[in-house]
Amino acid sequence: MSSEYQIGHEGEFSFRGHTLDELQEMELEEVAELLPARQRRSIVRGLTEEKHKLLEKAREAGEEETANDPIRTHLRDMPVVPEMVGLTFAVHDGQNFERVKVEPEMLGHYLGEFQLTRSSVEHGQAGIGATRSSKFVPLK
């Protein structure tokens, strides 16, 4: 099974045969041809106005080198494109914003995949009143 991305002998990242520098120089439509079908379709059909604004913010933040300030967004369905690599996004999970630092290995995925909307439930020990049968458990 071949991987979409590889790290070569020199430690250089490549995505479907292209280095990160080559990908960042490509137009969005050229990058879309390398993405998986679902992400490619969303780009080819046209990004929404909100997604274009997010890309503009990412371009400005990349030029200013202000990677410390996260870009806040509710757009969990935005595909990760090469312009976003190295930036920090604050992705909304339904309750609050959580930081996601975009790495090269995230190319072709959605922002929402890296911030889960549900947390795992950790139940405590059963005690008095936890269940109907625990009413008869003697106290220590």
UniProtKB/Swiss-Prot annotation:
GO terms for biological process: ribosomal small subunit assembly; translation. The keyword Ribosomal protein applies. GO terms for molecular function: rRNA binding; structural constituent of ribosome. Keywords: Acetylation, Ribonucleoprotein, Ribosomal protein, RNA-binding, rRNA-binding. It holds the Pfam family Ribosomal_S19. The keyword Coiled coil does not apply. One of its GO terms (cellular component) is cytosolic small ribosomal subunit. It comes from the Archaea. The modification N-acetylserine is found at S2. Protein S19 forms a complex with S13 that binds strongly to the 16S ribosomal RNA. Belongs to the universal ribosomal protein uS19 family. This is Small ribosomal subunit protein uS19. The lineage of its organism: Archaea, Methanobacteriati, Methanobacteriota, Stenosarchaea group, Halobacteria.
